[in-house]
Amino acid sequence: MAHGSTAHEVLAVVFQVREASEPVTKGRHRAKPQPNVLLWQRAKEPQRGAWSLPGGRLRNDEDMTTSVRRQLAEKVDLKELAHLEQLAVFSDPNRVPGTRMIASTFLGLVPSPASPELPPDTRWHPVNCLPPMAFDHGQMVDNARARLIAKLSYTNIGFALAPREFALSTLRDIYGAALGYQVDATNLQRVLARRGVITATGTIAQSGRSGGRPAALYRFTDAALRVTDEFAALRPPGLPG
């Protein structure tokens, strides 16, 4: 199809590790952390009502980062992100009908347990159970998830998913959810401490209803992205490191 003009849009793939209820036994459930992506329903044709990534057209007077932050604030009322970075460009001439639209995608992260107030047409969706999505937005989510998994290996990007202070069990659950496999808390603490990524706060968590020994609390040493080991790769248990 021939295109007489070209437009540019910015789209945000925003992840947060959120707790979901899963059945354990009849009548009993437990909270299971899992990665979610923020989606909103398109308000206009084509594919009006379809679930899609938040974003929109790039204005002539703004750069892409400014634009994506504006779109998130205006359209889904999301103003605070712990991390935002540009990902990839999707430029297939026929990716959307009508005017050719080039899309620049961004990865955004919201820490747990933040709970932004969302408009009625916007919702968190588990990445392993996504609804049918508009255009090529499903591919964009897959691309962003792969980038996040890779960066968890060689950077300190976990800071953007975790609370300010956390027990190692909480961090284990967040990393496990984001990576897609179980993570050992002791091994994770050893790796991240060796890289200077986390440090003990010297305080302990409040005891839960079940009692027991209170857990020591940790925090990330930085609240900005940095490479910690450019050749590192976290792998599922049983695979060679």
Stretch-by-stretch model annotation:
Residues 8-10, 32-36, 65-117, 129, ...:
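Active-site segment of metal-dependent pyrophosphate-handling enzymes
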Residues 53-61, 160-161:
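Short histidine-centered catalytic/ligand-binding loop motif
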Residues 200-241:
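Long, intrinsically disordered, low-complexity Ser/Thr/Pro-rich regulatory/activation regions
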Residues 105-108, 116-152, 163-170, 174, ...:
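NUDIX/MutT-family hydrolases
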